[in-house]
Amino acid sequence: MIGNIKIIAVCMCKVYDERNYRIIRALNNFAVENDYRLFVYHTCSDLYWKTLSEKGEQSVFDLIDYNITDAVVTFEEGVYAENVMTKIRMDAAQYGKPVISVGVEHDDCISIKFGYAKGFEQVVRHVIEQHGVRDIGFIAGRKDEENSEERIAVFRKLLEEYDIPFRNDVFYYGDYWSVPALKAVDDMIEKNKVPRAIICANDMMAIAAGAEFQRRGYKIPEDIIITGFDGSEEANFCTPMLTTSGCSYDDTAKTIIDVISKALAGEKPEKIYTVDYDLSVENSCGCKPSVEQINTGE
């Protein structure tokens, strides 16, 4: 605490990413309203390569002054240095500071999870039920990554529920990135195996795939339906706008502040909280867009 203002240390990577920026902005708004201030500690990389440069980056977390910090919030999704985040939680515990892990569940702190499975199920079910599609391809995230494998499991479960065959020839790992998604599209077109719909595990891959299909002469959604997942702002600027699913940043931020306030008031918060993902239906699946097209492509 500094004066009468309580301090929240926020730890993450890539604060400049659109999703991270939006959650930090929402969190700051709720924090200020409740007499908190944010001290944001972040790295420019995701600490994946374990280089000397990244080792230097992660030292930013050593700057956390637990003598003035009242609570710690970690955003661990996309951070490829579990030991770094573990050390933050352990250090905070030594000072008796509550820790809230957002996106990743831990036994040693309070966890706020996102309803990814339910949200992703809404997207897939919408394509099957509302549009009657039974020929569906899938561009997943990273192989063996928890969230990616969960979305694959949801996809396969729904195919089985509706007695739709799983097409292994149009199943790809896209690594949550545009380049592998482009390669997947090229493979489908060149081998003449384009399905009626492509479900993508995130918006970035869906936007890239849609653009490549259009470049190759396909119309969306007339020739192929494309859906994403994340609820990114970019989903509203592609043509057509992308059907996706995302969380409310305000709901996430409010949950974080409410949990911190309970912990600091001496109450015992729940160990796990869940923030739901909601379906956002636009015209990449063939539905009427919720708002007038922002970018018509004309």
Residue positions per predicted region:
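Flexible loop/turn connectors
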Residues: 34, 184-295
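Hydrophobic/aromatic beta-strand patches that form the interior of the parallel beta-sheet core
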Residues: 73, 100, 110-113, 137, ...
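An alpha-beta-alpha
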Residues: 121-164, 169, 271-287
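Short, solvent-exposed amphipathic alpha-helices that sit
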Residues: 19-33, 119-123, 146-165, 180, ...
